Amino acid sequence: MATYQTELDLFKNEVEQKQPNDFLQFAANYFTKRLEQQRTFVRNQESLALSKGIVLFPSTSKHDSVAASSASLSHGSSKANASQSGISSSGVDEDVLFKSPFVDRGPHSTHIVDHLDSTHSNTTASPAKASGGDAPGIFKGNFNVGTESQRKVNSSVDPMAPEPTATTHSFPRRSVVNPKPLPINFNAQRRTSVSGETLQPDHLDDWKPENFQEKSPEQVSRLEKAVGKNFLFNKLDSDSKKLVINSLEEKSIPQGKEIIKQGDEGDYFYIVEDGTVEFYVNNQKVNTSGPGSSFGELALMYNSPRAATVIASTDCILWALDRLTFRRILLGGSFKKRILYDDLLKNIPILKSLSTYDRAKLADALDTEYYEAGQTIIKEGDTGENFYFIEYGEADVSQEGKGVITKLGKGDYFGEVALLNDLPRQATVTATARTKVATLGKSGFQRLLGPVVDVLKLNDPTRSKH
């Protein structure tokens, strides 16, 4: 998102244009409108993410809240019964604590018995609670700060000591029959599921990778070839690809050293600069690769186990890229691209019928191409595979025997005739100045421009011929 300075500059320009009499009211109206636009955009992104199975803003459903309340009542009642029967709390099954990091006690120390006295049990199971009144909300358990929070943060805690008395709003826990003790640092630093980190794209404007280092022209040339072969980097724009290359970290690996091990969690993607590596699956050699090759791609997408063991068969020089850096670069580039193309697309008349959600999907599918003055973008008679929007620049449209028939500029589009009618290109389009175009492939054209196709057909210059 735009930085605060950009927002102030936009506001300043608006003030200079409108010259409002009531400045404060104008400012209030302006920023209220900007906030509404931003919130609308964020919610549309949430809908788009949900359609792809990604949850941007996790929440607790009503069903989960009811289940949690029931579990809490049952838990409190069983503790109270145990207390009244004279059974010590140590005889009750221990609870596994996998709670939010915002509660008073850490989740990774050990299994801890939750000692609730009969007073707290009775309070928890009171009729008011049972009837659903004042039930724990979404933040009551996760962000609960009780009297225990007065303890010093850096105070030493015996991991085997019993847990202090919980507050009345403690988060309900799952009971485990005959639990096995966990190591003290169990899962404290690593994820065990196939997942990705949560990132905020609006915080990436001024971010620079920790291992960022400008590479020499020779290194850039070699790494571009290696990166270009990999499907993960094919759709990156030139700036993002350059950032990836300059974020690669050089690693020297001696002969015989194990680089990655089958079954381990993957954190890095590797490019072989020099040397040879061998791949083993279940201790069986399956492949060998040398300079220019790469491996470990899935580590950039998911925190997934390694599919093979890789060993350096000679002394090797590798370039490594960690998953978090790649995801930041990819997300930051995609977010900026979506913002940029949303502004472009909503100003193109034929796309007025698209919703913000549809424009966002269209923006994700667009690729960028550059043409210098005199270069041909499409040629008459060729097979049509792409639809084009001009982001900036100028181009001439010409036909054989007729010469230049029209000129195109920013916001204009071309290439739709061949896609609509499955015909060869009906004209040649040549850049007359440096021109940047956004292109949409044939499959994306048919899939994403459904509401617009009818408008394009009405504006088809060859329509009278069919």
Swiss-Prot record:
**Bias-annotated ranges (Low complexity):** 71-80
List every position bearing Phosphoserine: 193
Pfam families xrefs: cNMP_binding, RIIa
Q: Which Gene3D superfamilies match?
A: Jelly Rolls
InterPro entries reported for this sequence: cAMP-dep_PK_reg_su-like (IPR050503), cAMP_dep_PK_reg_su (IPR012198), cAMP_dep_PK_reg_su_I/II_a/b (IPR003117), cNMP-bd_CS (IPR018488), cNMP-bd_dom (IPR000595), cNMP-bd_dom_sf (IPR018490), RmlC-like_jellyroll (IPR014710)
For this UniProt entry, the molecular function terms from Gene Ontology, in alphabetical order, are: cAMP binding; cAMP-dependent protein kinase inhibitor activity; protein kinase A catalytic subunit binding
Residue stretches of biased makeup (Basic and acidic residues): 109-118, 200-218
Q: Name one GO cellular component term.
A: nucleus
Q: Which residues cross the membrane?
A: none
Task: Point to the regions of Polar residues compositional bias.
Answer: 81-90
| CDD domains, A to Z | CAP_ED (cd00038), DD_R_ScPKA-like (cd12098)
Q: Can you tell me which family this protein belongs to? A: Belongs to the cAMP-dependent kinase regulatory chain family.
What is the protein's given name?
cAMP-dependent protein kinase regulatory subunit
What gene codes for this chain?
A: PKAR
